[in-house]
Design a protein with these regions (language model features):
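Conserved SAM-binding strand-loop segment of SAM-dependent methyltransferases
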Residues: 94-106
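A short glycine-rich, Lys/Arg-flanked "PGG" loop and its adjoining helix->strand segment in the class I
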Residues: 153-165
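Conserved SAM/SAH-binding beta-strand->alpha-helix loop
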Residues: 83-84
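N-terminal auxiliary segments of SAM/dcSAM-dependent transferases
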Residues: 1-20
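SAM-dependent methyltransferase
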Residues: 7, 165-224, 228
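Conserved SAM-binding loop of SAM-dependent methyltransferases across substrates and taxa
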Residues: 63-74
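Conserved alpha-helix/loop element of class I SAM-dependent methyltransferases that forms part
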Residues: 37-55
């Protein structure tokens, strides 16, 4: 995706960003959707941006469209993405704080590698606070990076580390059970599927073919269950027109 984003930014034209999955027909991501203005974003994304406050982390920021909106409002926002080309593009577009890193490895790595040899080595409260965020944004189904339900406890453990006291996670996802509806309106999930929202994808742009990756579409009830078991609660903030929703996750 990074190559497609970089080329579109430089030329304002790009070929198809194709998406493949064993469960679905070939699809494509219109690159214009990654460069939208606030006015062109879906209501759910606009609502999330309006709710963002404090120190903000924009996860999987891609081209930085959400970060730029918040930055223009004077917000303290940091964008994170694993793609070097996406990170480069965001910097060229004017995003001031950009990190090339995996969400699951963000924050406090050095202080977790070993026990301190003395009390003097313990991180100060201010230092810990600087590695935490008041709002974590995971938009455009950003929570999908978790990949599988089995990995949800790891996600909440990471929140324990980087979410500031009183902080919030604003994420959107979709209940895709409708994909498995039969003619009678009954949900018919294939027996081999552990959870109908767990899928594998691969992207292709021109001659660049990415590695397969797991992606999670999680329904709101399942998100509540997983969050509750890990000491978090979920508030359903808004529902979209395409089985999508915006959730607010906070520590109990």
């Amino acid at each position: 995706m990074g190559r497609a984003i970089a080329e579109y930014w430089k030329t304002k034209t790009a070929e198809r960003l194709r998406v493949f999955s064993p469960m679905f027909e070939e699809d494509e991501i219109p690159l214009t959707t990654l460069f939208r203005s606030y006015e062109d974003m879906p209501e759910i994304e606009r609502k999330a941006l309006d709710m963002a406050k404090g120190r903000i982390l924009d996860v999987g920021a891609a081209s930085g469209c959400h970060s730029l909106v918040l930055q223009d409002r004077g917000k303290d926002v940091t964008a994170i993405d694993i793609s070097p080309l996406s990170v480069e593009t965001m910097k060229e577009r004017g995003v001031k704080k950009v990190i090339e890193q995996d969400f699951f490895t963000l924050g406090g790595q050095a202080m977790e590698q070993r026990e301190p040899s003395s009390l003097l080595e313990w991180p100060s409260r201010d230092r810990v606070r600087r590695s935490q965020y008041d709002t974590i944004l995971m938009l455009m189904n950003g929570i999908g990076i978790v990949g599988t339900l089995e990995r949800m406890p790891e996600f909440f453990k990471q929140l324990d580390k980087i979410l500031a006291p009183g902080g919030q996670v604003l994420c959107d996802s979709s209940d895709i059970s409708y994909v498995f509806e039969d003619e009678e309106g009954m949900i018919d999930i294939p027996n081999e599927m552990d959870y109908y929202g767990e899928h594998s994808f691969r992207m292709q742009y021109k001659d660049t073919i990415g590695e397969p990756f797991d992606w999670l579409y999680i329904d709101a009830d399942t998100l509540r269950q997983k969050a509750g078991r890990c000491g978090y609660e979920v508030e359903l903030v808004a529902e979209g027109e395409h089985y999508d929703y915006l959730a607010r996750i906070t520590k109990k």
